[in-house]
Curated annotation (Swiss-Prot):
Its main location: nucleus. Heterodimer of Ku70 and Ku80. InterPro entries: Ku70/Ku80_beta-barrel_dom, Ku80, Ku_C_sf, Ku_N, Ku_PK_bind, SPOC-like_C_dom_sf, VWF_A, vWFA_dom_sf. It comes from Aspergillus sojae. This is ATP-dependent DNA helicase II subunit 2.
Amino acid sequence: MADKEATVYIVDVGRSMGECRNGRSVTDLEWAMQYVWDRITGTVATGRKTATMGVIGLRTDETSNELEDDVHFSHIAVLSNIKQFLMPDIRKLEDELKPSKTDKGDAISAIILAIQMIITHCKKLKYRRKIALVTNGQGRMSDEDLGEIVKKVKEDNIELVVMGIDFDDPEYGYKEEDKDPRKAENETLLRTLVEDCDGVYGTFEQAVAELDIPRVKSVRSVASFKGYLQLGNPEDYDSALRIPVERYYRTYPAKPPTASSFVLRSEPEAGQEEAESSEAAAATQKGSQSGDIGLTTVRTMRTYQVEDKSAPGGKIDIERDDLAKGYEYGRTAVHISETDENITILDTFAGLELMGFIQTDRYQRYMHMSNTNIIIAQRANDKAALALSSFIHALFELECYAVARLVVKENKPPVIVLLAPSIEPDYECLLEVQLPFAEDVRTYRFPPLDKVITVSGKVVTQHRNLPNDDLLDVMGKYVNSMELVDADEDGDPVETFPIDDSYSPVLHRIDAAIRARAIHPDQPIPPPSERLTKFSHPREDLIERSQKYLEKLIEIADVKKVPPKAKGRKRTRETEKPLSGLDVDALLHHEKRAKISPNNAIPEFKQTLAQAENIEAIKDATKQMMVIVEDQIKHSLGNANYDRVIEALGTMRDELVSYEEPASYNDFLGQLKDKLLQEKLGGDRQELWWLVRRNKLGLVTQRESDQSRVTDTEAKEVSLTKMKE
């Protein structure tokens, strides 16, 4: 479970925050809110109820706080008490955080008020407490009772963060020229306060510059297995090894947030609102939390029906409890009773049993089949830690891996895992990955890359398909010129692309887009951060350095550009000339094909279309294929010819779409279905039409071809029309 958090943001909205300074095109408040919105939306995106926030407005026109009777707390407004933030709260906060008409208000008093809010909300419970002050340092600040503030912050373990606009920061290397004396005095006051509280003090130049750095989410690990690592059967042998261990993820893929479906909420009919279920009410509440009260979540309702000719409509409804579990075998649902199903379940007990050992040099890394996990000793068990440490060191010294059988939970299927020792200065563990069973391994033999073996068994090392020495030499130089590891002044290697600077573009781009839309729903989504796109293209210096080797490689390898594939009607386009410049058809004296042979229908159909000079020739070829396909169906013994028919239909569909004649295919498919419905092609052929639907060989729609007049709805109706009972 994640730690509870309570954060209070103090945002300076004084009149001076509405001005643009130091050549910026945005106001100080707009510039500062980039940081505030980034932190708030990042917390909202977690969806955790334990991640709470509050917002205080500093130097506001009005005063609204529990200490407003004290003059020191004037022009300070609590815009939101500490709570879980949702989309409506962000919308409300966006409207309230506007520059005021006054510069009165004390930032130190706002910090005192934030401390009081945290104490009231958190009480003595375990929370991660934090106060973040965002200001430009203008106006008056009181330096009274700073010692008491520091004492209270440390007592309640509150982290104090002060982010200042144009604040001097020697560590970051920023200094504002011609600084106002009062602002300089306020900066010194805030810096002293933060340093005494062991907090964080920084300038917005650094904070805004680091906003495009994706934040990697830290996740608290949860044990996926708790049991015993054992060698031998402890029930039969006293010498058996048995160590209490725990298993955690070492690596796990992060996934972007999934989409949710919403619909416009309709007004309930009379009497319907009272009968609304608790589930529907919860869904409605969730829709309102999304920030738009006009939306509600999509709710799924399933009904089960069976055919009954005596019932109205030919079907009757049944309850889910009356259904029996079945498994698909081909296109047949096979029922297995609960008694028979228990036979197929392997009775297993949770545990990690050692099966054997293997030398490290005999293991191939391509055998990995899963993410990496770690095995550590049971927590707070010194005896188990000592025993596991001895086992880890034994594997390390003998250069061995252990092979074990893992059952995570009782009656779960077992898996075979590899255990590798990992020893660091202050940390030891076993790295665990899943291995394949013998039946999972598929062995394929490929021809060698450095030689050619003829039919007679002769080995040839000089061949047109093998690279010569010159080509290998140039390729080696080209690869070396693209080396990503540079050298420093001492000649030591320096990694140009450190793995820690590599982020998932999909994950962080979606996250940034969601947060941008949450803050500014009517503005376009900003472009992706350069940190996400810099690995999508090579560096300029690498391109320049390798260009001469690339040109030499193209010359020696005799690389030629393939002509681009022409678009448009195949029948009106010129025949592509081969690179050799020779007319192959003229050399072979190919004559135009007049009739398509049923024995070689598909290749001859393609050839006929390629030689067609007008639409009539295309239609004639299509009619010939129609006759051949119908003849194959009519004379098919059962489903013997169905595969040939499906292949022919697929070829006809693709070719006629590419020749922009989808109407010919649609007409043929409509005629074919009518004949199948009337059983004119050798009796009942329902299975064939099912294959047509499964292979998505239905009508060509307008979405697939501009020449088609069939809509998606019409194509679906034709496809789903039931065959004759």
